[in-house]
């Protein structure tokens, strides 16, 4: 599942999401 929770996602988690 692809989720875009920018309000709850941290910068590190966002970077990990981009890698995955």
From Swiss-Prot:
Disulfide bonds: none annotated. Keywords: Hydrolase, Plant defense, Protein synthesis inhibitor, Toxin. One of its GO terms (molecular function) is toxin activity. Residues 1-20 are annotated as: Disordered. It catalyses: Endohydrolysis of the N-glycosidic bond at one specific adenosine on the 28S rRNA. One of its GO terms (biological process) is negative regulation of translation. The keyword Transmembrane does not apply. Its EC number is 3.2.2.22. It comes from the Eukaryota. The keyword Hydrolase applies. Residues 8-20 have a biased composition (Polar residues). Belongs to the ribosome-inactivating protein family. Type 1 RIP subfamily. This is Ribosome-inactivating protein. It comes from Cucurbita pepo (Vegetable marrow).
